[in-house]
Every structure is written in C-alpha cells, then in structure tokens.
C-alpha cells in the first residue's frame, strides 16, 4: 500500500495532522516537544483512495534528549519504507534550523515531499508560508490541523500524485487488522503425535490430560503463556470435545478440529511423530495450512524415541521436508516433549514467524526486488508474446500479499509464480512467512 510519512521537529503538530488525516484520535497529542516517540501507522481514505499514514517521532537535532538518536533513526528508516513525505512546520514560529536539517535529509530521496505549514487557520495568515519555499520543495500548503483549514488541499495533492496502480490496489484493501500483543497458536497434528505433551512441556505443568490413547484430551484447552515478554495463547486442538452420539471415527474429528484451529490461529504448530515421519494425514493437514496461507512451524516431536544420531535425525528431517515441500517457509524444530528439549527454540521460531507475517515493505523496495529476480529468469512467453510484470504493491493485512500488475495474468504458470514467490521471500526477508501473489491484468500504455 502507498505509504505517506509525516515528519517534522517536535511540537509542530504532526500528531494532530495525523489524527485529522486518519479521522480518529490515535496519536497522543500534548503541548510538550517529542510526545510521540514511536512510529504510529494507520490507514486513511481520501477521494476513494486508501493509503497508509505514518506518524514519526519528532526530529531532534541535539542528542541531549536520550530519544533523539532513536527518533532520527526512525525518520531515516522511513526514507526507504515510505513513498511520500509530509514535512510539518510551524507557521507561527517560522523557519528554523531544525526544519532545514530535516529538509536536507528528505532531499536525499526523489520521492514526493509536501510541506504543511501548520497553525495557519485563515487566509490573512497565509503569507507566512512563503519563507518555507526556502526548504527547496515546490508543494507548500497552509494548514491548520486543529481547525481543518487547508487539509483538503494537502490531501488532494497527495492523492493526485499516487500512481494509478496504487489507486487500483487500494480498491483491494479491506479493514486494517491490528497486530495483537498475544500470538494465537494452534497445535495441530494427527492423534498421538504428542500435541498435549508438547503443550505441557511448554507450560511446565500437566495442563492437558495425556495418555497413549489417541485423542484423550477431551476439554477445550486455551492457555495463556508468557515467554521473554511475549504472550502466547495456545489452542490445543485435541481438546475440542468429540460428539459422543455419533461415531464418525477419530480421523474425521481430527481433521475437522484442525480446520477450525487453522482458521482461528495466527501461527500453526504442526506436530509430527519422529518415529513415523510425515504421513498421509500429516500431508492433509499441511495442505490445509497451505490453503489458508497460514504461518507455521513444523515440530518433529518424540526425538527421544529414535537413535540420537545426527544421520538419523537428518534423515527424518529430510523426509518431512520432502513430503511437505509445498510449505517450504515453515521452519522445522526437533523436540522431545518428554525431556523438554527444543522448547525454547520452538517459542523463538513461533515469535519470528509471527513477526514476519506482519512485515511490510515499501513499494519501491518491492519493485526493485522483482526487477532483481527477473534479471535471473524472465517469465516464459504466452501465445508468442513476452509476459510482463509492470509493477507491484503490497496489500494491507496478513499474510503478506502482493498485487502484481501484468499484461496476461492467465499466462503466468504455477512453476514460475513459485519461483517468484520463493525468491521474493529470500530477497525481502520473508523466509519464514507464507506470501500470496495476486495478478491483475493491465494494458501497456502506448504513447
């Protein structure tokens, strides 16, 4: 999604303008320099176009404020992530050295910059904007974020400069999903793979009843757990009660419970018995993970039941990876729930996978990555004509979803899209997250 960062020195009204643009009070606003310390991200809609808005912390020249280097780093990071910038300055106070310093940083990029001269709430005050042309940007607007004055003109200019493909992509965007502090984790797997034992090993207590009989956990088990300041809500899928009056068989209910859990969870932990390796039923479960594009961690459990030799463990791991080849992004962790081995590594992987599933990349970064990948391998021709990818953008929400504008969507075959997907994961840092590619047809312009 097109990303616009609001930058400026402390106490010029960045957060007030941010709240005005998104239409709700999300950033804390006080008359104290530097109240907003962290970047706050939200979506906005103007003239039917949806885009992302970032409220950065106030840029501070002096390092006397302990937050100054951090805030400066946040702004400089936005130079890469954002597609455009609104530089907010104070029309009453006038041009300052700090404003010039921020402008100097913004001139490093060739991306659009709009200067919002804030605290101008009537036409008589508009003459105050002229000195700000000294910053070297053409688009300077008098605004009052409190009184709404001039904000419409500013947003009209921003939206007018959004590329056509980003406007089209914004039509695909639904409600923005907020990242939760709690990771919902579904532990899935065929009966007796060790799901409840694994949960107990994580919790360090006998929370779920365990025996050697498949499906012995009868009650719903939703358990909140915290590790290294990260909260997890574990959903032990074996805990959903089986219908007592209808005997459809264990596998029927196992798959049914798994499907519900996969839809609900943020991260799936797919537990596989080390003695059996990946079975046909494990393949069915993994296909559900793939179908719903869910982040996942594959756990090869019960390694205490196989010879503790590296060649044996590698053979098991390779068998699982080969059979579940269609979810290559899911990291594999080898555990012994009985001996509590591999538990810390599992929790780390769950956290990494979750964070990657929320990762966003800027439009420029994405298109540079695609250009780099296409230099390695061009898409095949279609009906004698070359297939082309004109540009791409990341849509809102998770899992990461990229909309590609191409000339012939039907010509892009699965093997090439898989090549593109795998390389995008590597280049953009989504190695542990599933990504989706959507294709939209677009005619090539002829000038």
Swiss-Prot record:
The keyword Aminoacyl-tRNA synthetase does not apply. Residues 2-166, 183-358 form the EngA-type G domain. GTP 2 binds at residues 189-196, 236-240, 301-304. It comes from the Bacteria. One of its GO terms (biological process) is ribosome biogenesis. The keyword Nucleotide-binding applies. Residues 359-443 form the KH-like domain. GTP 1 binds at residues 8-15, 55-59, 118-121. Keywords: GTP-binding, Nucleotide-binding, Repeat, Ribosome biogenesis. Disulfide bonds: none annotated. GO terms for molecular function: GTP binding; ribosome binding. CDD domains: EngA1 (cd01894), EngA2 (cd01895). Belongs to the TRAFAC class TrmE-Era-EngA-EngB-Septin-like GTPase superfamily. EngA (Der) GTPase family. GTPase that plays an essential role in the late steps of ribosome biogenesis. Associates with the 50S ribosomal subunit. This is GTPase Der. It comes from Persephonella marina (strain DSM 14350 / EX-H1).
